[in-house]
């Protein structure tokens, strides 16, 4: 029966299982012999057990498991030997003896085990034995077996390496220099073995070998960890011996995987203080690394680590004699220079780290930040980059770069001090410029940054011009209406932050802003010009407040209203009607309230402009009713007109109301006009209400007449009730022309018509309205106010 093919994983598990079983058998025998004090037999079983490590069949992962199992058993042997030597057994004989083991792998593992025990028992032999052991390990040149053997040597000697602060006889026991030499040599040899792994086996297994090498890298890195743990390794020794030795090995091995891992290892395991004193040699080595090494990640890791160190509250910070930013700036430039094929996004990533470093270590040095931006501009010029696509990696990195100053300063005015910020902005394509412009404006709004001068306004407007004016590179298709409205609302809100303490300066700021916004095209100005008009009205009120200290305030107010008029006119040219109409009405109110010289003329002009817009531009009946109601409401609040101007305006309102297309609209507008003849005010009566009772009655009678002409019965009754409420209002305001008889007639009319309406939700609403009106009258009749009219004779 044919056997089924095993998967590589199953094969590995089977081989490992067999090896572990053999280890268990031999270790059991070894321990039995040790318990019976049969040392020679025990060593024979130990040698057999170690023979399992001679295999070439296991993957690094499986070999590691086997190695760990054997290491644990060897520890038992080490403890036994230590006890024996303490009792007086001769070590020298044993050290000689294990050298006769048949195979080199078992022999060297046993030599290390015995050698370590020897050193612990007789420290005076330490220097020679350590040298002996590290040299002997050269005997195993198979990468996998050699790496684990040397790792065993490193682990076993962990606690016996000479270090600072212990009494020593340097001739025999060695000193810190011997420890550094020992670990550096072991590191160099392990790195060579590790690098050599890539050349073993078939080229088709290359990817698998690279994966296996990745798994084994920690064995090589452990040497660097060991060096960093030696107390005797101070800054001076690190600079002169340790780093020099490591970098020499790293640069010379010419292997990208090893170089990248070991450089990152150096950054991680040694203290920040050491890195600060050795920046130049480390960064110079970066420039010499293999072309396939991702140098960017190495440099960024170092920069980020030192930036954190500088930022630590409890730390000493960066020593003043170390020009950290300058060193990194120069060395990063050298690295970029030495790597012509470095991807553009990696080049920008390095600048991102540099700018982070400048921000964290030198928060007050705006020039350092600008230096990074300038370098980036120069790099882009060399690469002939322009309009970088939003989707590209370079665009993402450039976005990160430019967001850092925005987020760190949280003040656009500081960002504007960076001369190279705007030039870099221009490298983006349309989409990226637009999203970055939104980002900048959102930051201004979030932090309420006030823009206080014309130059600042100019600079910001130019920076975010993608939101303010059409661009040559913008897409042909129309933008999404919602997105467009959101972007423009952002700009509109920003206008309210253009404010100077000095009113004259504020006027110049608004003028500058209008120049930019005026060129925005019809779609944009409906969002951007109205806030500008309101800002102008606010400024006019400020001049009024300053009238005691500024004798030219009235002329300045006229100038402001002229500015507002021009700005609103631009909206009319953009074929907008309702928006400019509202702005003219607001202007008329403002002019009337401020009361500067010529204010009546200005207010009249603004009112008549609103009328012109109403008559010429608004044709939709709903919009017409809303507009005339607004005009009447605004005019009713104004008290700056003489009778000469007030009379034609109120007549005009009444006329316009009666000319509305739909009868219900006419009725409502005409009845609203009644208020103009009652509570309207002019200068001839010193601002007191007109109280023209007769004209009020004329309006209300006309409204009733119009309501009578309505064909829809429910609409007709509804209008009657609304007009009844107007009558009641004026009766309570003590208009003599409105009598109880008039009220009774209208109530009777409504009572007659209501039952004829078809049953519906609308009819229910009408009934409710009428009921509420009668309830009001009932309450007034039963408990009349002392000053109010008496409802005597009212029939309810």
Swiss-Prot record:
Record's signal peptide: none
Membrane protein topology class: Peripheral membrane protein
Span list, region Interaction with SLC11A2: 438-796
Keyword Cytoplasm: yes
Protein name from the UniProt record: Vacuolar protein sorting-associated protein 35
GO MF annotation: an example: D1 dopamine receptor binding
Compartment annotation: Cytoplasm; Membrane; Endosome; Early endosome
GO cellular component: cytosol; early endosome; endosome; endosome membrane; late endosome; lysosome; mitochondrion; mitochondrion-derived vesicle
Purpose: Acts as a component of the retromer cargo-selective complex (CSC). The CSC is believed to be the core functional component of retromer or respective retromer complex variants acting to prevent missorting of selected transmembrane cargo proteins into the lysosomal degradation pathway. The recruitment of the CSC to the endosomal membrane involves RAB7A and SNX3.
Lineage: Eukaryota, Metazoa, Chordata, Craniata, Vertebrata
Phosphotyrosine modified-residue sites: 791
